[in-house]
């Protein structure tokens, strides 16, 4: 059997695989904020990015390695393809971290070998020991992944894994790259790897999966029963296509059903020892932070962290819950850090009190960002009687986005009504400090604002998503707007909140435009792109 650390190790890849969600690009400050919250959450490994992809990715991984973790904190990991330039860049980026890991991979399925890598099985068998050994020359902790393992020939897969371990890999990751496998098949795959790889006892078995068939979490739990001891997952399940296995669902499944899973770890069913090191009370905070910074709204019926996860509409259910919550709830909302507490901050609250509460919520702002957030807080306190944690999260999330914005919104005015043509007047400050104003008509106030902004910024794009939701209850609630725009096939998100949803929409659109401008001309490599093609292009 594979190495058993006595519990499940949580490998968070929100900042790498999660960021590959269309429109979920994050800047350095946002990545650092998420990494710091992941450390508070208690994950074992943070995959901070793919350093070779671009200078921006390298800088973000390096910044996280310098500022997050420590001897008692998480391992900081970087991803690299099985090539020396990739591995060297990864090693340099993670070098400042006290605990570091290189995660290198190569495809093992015939379809990937033939159509993507254009390599034979023999060539892969030659590459694996060379590249794992090269990674091992930089760090003691090396993880190796067999990309598309779920569709690979088993005998070839066993041979590759054995070679990787004998070359120094400490962790072997088995990815279901396209979300194809079913739970029983995945369990059998992990079991057969344990049975057929002679040196598997020298490495921890890990799993990575996508949710294309909605089976990622179920697959992982079956893998755990058969010896997998590291789970690669993301906050809110974000990721390419249908997303990755959701961290919060895995953690709470292992928490709530501990008595069921304990025997698979050689424990008595009643053992109270947690199966992971995650602090469950940080789950809701982590979910909201990732949602706010990526602009990816969590669906209301999402397990564990959705707005309706602990809501009861049925009268029968409500009656039962009032009498005893266990009648219809298997999780106490407080276990995941969800509470209805309102913070007692108001017009007379000082900067220190606001800063302390923001730190509790996972935001560690620099002096300039704190001043901006405090100004917005005071403005909101003049318009809203009660300030909740959700309000604070909404108003501060923009402060870590686009600190060097090219466009700044100065003024928005609209006139509209039953017998009026919607008209917007917008003033924007450019990078040179010059103010420009435009007036536009539209089918509605938001359309008019967007048209005015487009005429001022002259950044061609396609608006593909506009959504607005109430942050809290009440007529004075903040309206939270998320906007996605597209150019050249790339998606960019903008997010903002205000008691005036038209103002929020204008700021969200500006934020999306600033992301677009920041990314314009910046080359970035996807880790699953054909290495040979990339090298020919000289990237």
Swiss-Prot record:
Reactions this protein catalyses: 3-methyl-2-oxobutanoate + acetyl-CoA + H2O = (2S)-2-isopropylmalate + CoA + H(+)
EC category: transferase
Functional description taken from the UniProt entry: Catalyzes the condensation of the acetyl group of acetyl-CoA with 3-methyl-2-oxobutanoate (2-ketoisovalerate) to form 3-carboxy-3-hydroxy-4-methylpentanoate (2-isopropylmalate).
Cofactors named for this entry: Mn(2+)
Subcellular location: Cytoplasm
One BP term from GO: L-leucine biosynthetic process
Matching NCBIfam families: leuA_bact, PRK00915.1-3
Binding site for Mn(2+): 17, 208, 210, 244
Name of the protein this chain belongs to: 2-isopropylmalate synthase
Organism listed in the record: Prochlorococcus marinus (strain NATL2A)
């Amino acid at each position: 059997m594979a190495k058993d650390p006595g519990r499940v190790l949580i490998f968070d890849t929100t900042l790498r695989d999660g960021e590959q969600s269309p429109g979920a690009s994050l800047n350095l400050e946002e990545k650092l904020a998420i990494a710091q919250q992941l450390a508070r959450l208690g994950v074992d490994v943070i995959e901070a990015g793919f350093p070779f992809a671009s200078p921006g990715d390298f800088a973000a991984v390096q910044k996280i390695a310098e500022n997050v973790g420590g001897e008692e904190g998480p391992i900081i990991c970087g991803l690299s393809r099985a090539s020396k330039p990739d591995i060297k860049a990864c090693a340099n980026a993670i070098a400042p971290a006290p605990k570091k890991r290189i995660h290198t991979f190569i495809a093992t399925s015939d379809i990937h070998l033939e159509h993507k890598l254009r390599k034979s099985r023999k060539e892969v068998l030659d590459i694996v020991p060379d590249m794992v050994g090269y990674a091992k020359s930089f760090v003691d902790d090396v993880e190796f992944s067999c990309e598309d393992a779920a569709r690979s020939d088993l005998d070839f897969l066993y041979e590759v894994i054995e070679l990787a371990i004998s070359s120094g890999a400490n962790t072997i990751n088995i990815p279901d790259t396209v979300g194809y496998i079913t739970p029983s098949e995945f369990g059998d795959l992990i079991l057969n790897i344990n049975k057929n790889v002679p040196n598997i006892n020298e490495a921890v078995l890990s799993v990575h999966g996508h949710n294309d068939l909605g089976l990622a979490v179920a697959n992982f739990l079956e893998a755990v029963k058969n010896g997998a001891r590291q789970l690669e997952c993301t906050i809110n399940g974000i990721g390419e296509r249908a997303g990755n296995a959701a961290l919060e669902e895995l953690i709470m499944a292992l928490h709530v059903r501990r008595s069921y899973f304990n025997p698979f770890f050689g424990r008595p069913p009643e053992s109270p020892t947690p199966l992971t090191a995650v602090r469950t009370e940080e789950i809701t905070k982590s979910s909201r932070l990732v949602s706010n910074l990526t602009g990816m709204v969590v669906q209301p019926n999402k397990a564990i962290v959705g707005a309706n996860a602990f809501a009861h509409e049925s009268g029968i259910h409500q009656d039962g819950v009032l009498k005893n919550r266990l009648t219809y709830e298997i999780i106490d909302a407080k276990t995941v850090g969800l509470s209805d507490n309102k913070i007692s901050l108001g017009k007379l609250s000082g900067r220190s009190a606001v800063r302390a509460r923001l730190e509790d919520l996972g935001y560690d702002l620099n002096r300039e960002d704190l001043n901006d957030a405090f100004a917005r807080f005071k403005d909101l306190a003049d318009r809203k009687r009660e300030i909740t944690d959700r309000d604070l999260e909404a108003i501060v999330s923009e402060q870590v986005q686009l600190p060097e914005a090219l466009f700044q919104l100065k003024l928005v005015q609209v006139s509209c009504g039953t017998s009026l043509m919607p008209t917007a007047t917008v003033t924007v400050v450019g990078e040179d400090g010059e103010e420009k104003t435009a007036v536009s008509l539209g089918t509605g106030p938001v359309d008019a604002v967007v048209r005015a902004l487009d005429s001022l910024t002259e950044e061609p794009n396609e608006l593909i998503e506009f959504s607005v939701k109430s942050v809290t209850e009440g007529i004075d609630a903040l309206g939270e707007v998320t906007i996605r725009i597209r150019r050249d096939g790339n998606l960019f998100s903008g997010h903002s909140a205000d008691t005036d949803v038209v103002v929020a929409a204008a700021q969200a659109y500006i934020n999306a435009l600033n992301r677009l401008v920041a990314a314009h001309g910046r080359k970035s490599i996807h880790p699953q792109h054909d290495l040979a093609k990339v090298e020919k292009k000289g990237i």
